[in-house]
Design a protein with these regions (language model features):
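Short, well-formed alpha-helical segments that are part of the catalytic scaffolds
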Residues: 1-20
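Non-catalytic, C-terminal membrane-associated alpha-helical segments of glycosyltransferases
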Residues: 235-286
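Glycine-rich, basic loop-to-helix element that forms the pyrophosphate-binding segment
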Residues: 50-67
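Short beta-strand-to-loop acidic/aromatic patch adjacent to the donor-nucleotide binding site
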Residues: 72-83
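A short, conserved alpha-helix in the catalytic core of glycosyltransferases
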Residues: 153, 159-164, 169-196
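Conserved donor NDP-sugar-binding/catalytic core segment of glycosyltransferases
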Residues: 87-123
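A conserved acidic beta->alpha catalytic loop
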Residues: 27-37, 52, 82-83
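Short, flexible, basic/aromatic active-site loop/helix in glycosyltransferases
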Residues: 125-146
Length: 286
């Protein structure tokens, strides 16, 4: 399935390509409703137009439930800007099938993602106190990780009811991390597949600070990032290791967004508002 938000022609082309490989659902969070024919989508695609931005979590839940009702056993999840290769489309569900035989508690698997703007292939991640542990994507065997980004991941639908849906109160940021953390807290497994790659752009245009490139976002996205980080820090099932790392990173992020991203005041204001709303329990759309 793919989540649309104000898609361009390339997004439609990517969706049509996916539909040639697997049953495909497109959930569109664009404010203006269009038909699948107007967009140029393949007739085989199930198209759900929300007519409003209901958030990534709601859109994912809609698409995943649609695939489950259609009798699918797994769900490949993509952002509209992701470029999955034919190899990934064929092999990721096959890897999940093999891993399910070995362990029926495998909930999610995913490739290493590659963003050339941020320096190439990103490592997989395990939580550590004060600092994330980075696992380089090498070798052929899947490796256990603490979370995966949504795009490019393949979800075992047999685990969906037990783990539960994506948390719609988060709206957008940390939705993937929260679901993985919840799955692992219930004894399920998340696996990275180092042999597979996904071309994916994380965030907007990066900003370079002291030689390191950070993904750029709008001030509103930074609101959600800080609000949801605080919200997750307050939840008991979220590991202390992740909380400690996030508390270290939060002031650094705040400084980067407030000093190096324009308009500086808007980024700083929305980030601080997010922190405040996280403390008072504000959830959902801004």
């Amino acid at each position: 399935m793919i989540v649309f938000y104000r898609p361009d022609r390339d997004c439609v082309i990517r969706a049509n390509r996916l539909a040639r490989a697997w049953p495909c659902v497109v959930v569109d969070n664009t404010e203006c409703v269009a038909t699948s024919e107007q967009l140029g989508l393949d007739p085989q695609i199930t198209y759900l137009a929300n007519g409003a931005n209901l958030g990534i979590a709601t859109a994912l839940n809609q698409g995943i439930n649609c695939l489950k009702e259609a009798g699918c056993t797994c769900a490949l999840l993509f952002d509209q800007d992701s470029e999955p290769s034919s190899q990934l489309l064929a092999e990721l569900p096959a890897v999940l099938s093999v891993e399910r035989v070995r362990n029926d508690r495998v909930a999610l698997i995913g490739p290493a993602y590659e963003d050339l703007r941020l320096g190439g292939v990103a490592p997989f991640v395990r939580f550590g106190y004060l600092k994330l542990k980075r696992v380089q994507p090498t070798g052929q065997q899947p490796v256990e990780v603490d979370f995966l980004i949504t795009s490019g991941s393949c979800l075992n639908l047999a685990t969906w009811a037990a783990i539960g849906p994506m948390d719609e109160s988060l709206f957008i940021d940390f939705v993937d991390l929260e679901w993985c953390v919840r799955a692992r807290s219930k004894g399920y497994v998340v696996l990275g597949v180092p042999a597979l790659r996904l071309s994916h752009e994380l965030g907007g245009e990066p900003v370079q600070v002291f030689g390191r490139r950070y993904p750029g976002h709008s001030p509103v996205r930074h609101y959600y990032l800080f609000r949801n980080a605080v919200a997750l820090i307050r939840r008991g099932y979220v590991p202390l290791s992740w909380k400690s790392t996030e508390l270290v990173k939060m002031p650094i992020r705040l400084a980067i967004y407030g000093l190096f991203m324009r308009p500086r005041l808007a980024h700083l204001r929305m980030s601080l508002l997010g922190i405040w709303h996280g403390f008072i329990g504000r959830a959902g759309a801004l």
